[in-house]
Amino acid sequence: MHHVNKYFNQTMVIEALKMSFYKLNPKQLIKNPIMFVVEVGMLLTLILICFPDIFGTSYLSRGYLITIFIILLITILFANFSEAFAEGRGKAQADSLRQAQSNLTARLIEENGAYRIVNATELKAGQNIRVENGETIPADGVVINGLATVDESAITGESAPVIKESGGDFDGVIGGTLVTSDWLEIRVESEAGTSFLDKMIALVEGAERNKTPNEIALFTLLTTLTIIFLVVIVTLYPIASYLHLILPIAMLIALTVCLIPTTIGGLLSAIGIAGMDRVTQFNVLAKSGRAVEVCGDVDVMILDKTGTITYGNRIASEFLPVNQQMMEKLIVAAYMSSIYDDTPEGKSIVRLAKQMYINELPKDIDGTYKPFTAETRMSGIITNEISVFKGAPNSMINLVKQQQGNIPLNIESICMDVSSKGGTPLIVIENNVMLGVIYLKDVIKDGLVERFAELRKMGIETVMCTGDNALTAATIAKEAGVDRFVAECKPEDKIKVIKDEQAKGHIVAMTGDGTNDAPALAQANIGLAMNSGTISAKEAANLIDLDSNPTKLIEVVKIGKQLLMTRGALTTFSLANDVAKYFAILPALMMSTIPEMTSLNIMHLSSPKSAIISALIFNALIIVALIPIAMKGVKVKGYSIDRIFINNMLIYGLGGLIVPFLGIKLIDMIVQFFV
């Protein structure tokens, strides 16, 4: 469980209670038309308490009016509390993040190599600083020298320290994190007010949360229903007068509050805020509530193989020469092509070569290193004497053919054998001569088969995109349990895959971390960028994963589904409540004048006065009872969409009809002794 959970404490509850009273301000409450109607009713009741005969002869005691006033006030406070409590969790996390960057100093490295202590707010991009064991990193940056473990729990909530070193995928550091061993020299990448921590605080705290389109649509529906019920109540008054039925204004106010959808009206904002907070608990920052909501509509999920389906670091496990006489040359060539390769794969090749080669391998090679690119799909080194490259089979075969070299007869069968095992083959060439294959082993992450099966039940199709050949991709896809795969997929190809799916009417989600992923992240309906990724990727995405774990996309989509289902379930419950309360209260009010109504009074409430008070009390208590569901969401794990729909209709639809009858009757049995 992540660090946000510690904010479920007494202090936060007290703050939420204070905010509940602050939100009584009509300027605040008018944003929620349903609860605003309740407040207007409460104020009218207060006027009746002070001036009982202002709307005509009063038939109700002042004590009864005060009771109605108090219950209406409590109803509004409960609704305000649910929203304030949900908001408080985000603000508490922002306070924690703010503490991580307070009162920081930095050890600035001068041009002459000397150190000078400065305030962290004085740092400029491009300056170099040194951070030692036990010190807090004062600004975002890139490691240029040193190796150390860093505690990032203040940012990510993950207690295990991570290793940071220059080069590779683990050279980025975040201001506010703690160095727990050794030392690092860091080049500053951000200035005061523009750091990642500052952006996180702005995202989490947010001056004002904008309503999502679905929320606006639902609010419009609920407001329309409220207006309809108001019209019903207004027309009920002359009808009652015609039937010589006395319905005091206070009773009509109470009846209005009971019949309008106050339950979902009081919880709707809390549901949306809590949905964003549940995403935050998984260490994912949502740039808007809309992003989380769209996750609930996702039906196609595009996943990278490396880092998402398999562990990010493929490991060199074997050298496979075209013939045994080539083994030694293959090991040396593989080593030379990887000596300046800072990727995890390159480092694993160097380690394996050192383990297998008897003689001492050169530590430094004077030559020009050619790094891997998505276009060439190869890397290597060119010296005065030789050129050595390793790369994807298709790229290497094409290169040798272009230079009129020979293709060994067994090279393709070696590659196919590696691919059939789910591994990645890299062909090694020296001076345009193929020496053999490096077997990079992919390991599929635990538990993915079950999670993909769960997504399938929820109606979500999974598509694996990989640069591997079709045989390797098919093997991995079958083992992992994904629905489809796209082999030999370049970053730019992902946009085509996304557009093709969107053209079919699908809502698409994907993950990415590189600059070349940015266009696809922007094109996808939901883009989840890694915190360790480039700035352009994070700007293009609408979700950022602080743990840089691409598998999180699965959890975020499930949370989005849960958000929509929670909103739907509680709306169903609220509307069913209104129907039940309508048939529970009206017969009790009108049976004295219309005897035929007695047959509809199935609850046998003791009197019209106790019926109104009981319904009002139930109306207030049900909001409190449903706050935990609004905060945690309804359960969706392991069920198909149809099964979830049936379950929700039985629990929240049928339950919404039955619970008011039982609840109001039980309360009436107690209230009748006091009214």
From Swiss-Prot:
InterPro entries on file: ATPase_P-typ_cyto_dom_N, ATPase_P-typ_P_site, ATPase_P-typ_TM_dom_sf, ATPase_P-typ_transduc_dom_A_sf, HAD-like_sf, HAD_sf, P-type_ATPase_bsu_IA, P_typ_ATPase
Pfam families reported in the protein's UniProt record: E1-E2_ATPase, Hydrolase
Membrane topology: Multi-pass membrane protein
Record's function text: Part of the high-affinity ATP-driven potassium transport (or Kdp) system, which catalyzes the hydrolysis of ATP coupled with the electrogenic transport of potassium into the cytoplasm. This subunit is responsible for energy coupling to the transport system and for the release of the potassium ions to the cytoplasm.
Domain of life of the source: Bacteria
Binding site for ATP: 341, 345, 372-379, 390
Catalytic reactions on record: K(+)(out) + ATP + H2O = K(+)(in) + ADP + phosphate + H(+)
Record HAMAP family: KdpB (MF_00285)
Residue positions of the active site: 304
GO cellular component term, pick one: plasma membrane
Record protein name field: Potassium-transporting ATPase ATP-binding subunit 2
Transmembrane segments: 34-54, 65-85, 216-236, 245-265, 569-591, 611-631, 644-664
EC number annotated for this UniProt entry: 7.2.2.6
Family statement: Belongs to the cation transport ATPase (P-type) (TC 3.A.3) family. Type IA subfamily.
SUPFAM superfamilies documented for this protein: Calcium ATPase, transduction domain A (SSF81653), Calcium ATPase, transmembrane domain M (SSF81665), HAD-like (SSF56784)
Subunit structure: The system is composed of three essential subunits: KdpA, KdpB and KdpC.
Gene: kdpB2
GO molecular function, a single term: ATP binding
Record's subcellular location: Cell membrane
Ligand binding (Mg(2+)): 513, 517
Location, primary (coarse class): membrane
UniProtKB keywords: ATP-binding, Cell membrane, Ion transport, Magnesium, Membrane, Metal-binding, Nucleotide-binding, Phosphoprotein, Potassium, Potassium transport, Translocase, Transmembrane, Transmembrane helix, Transport
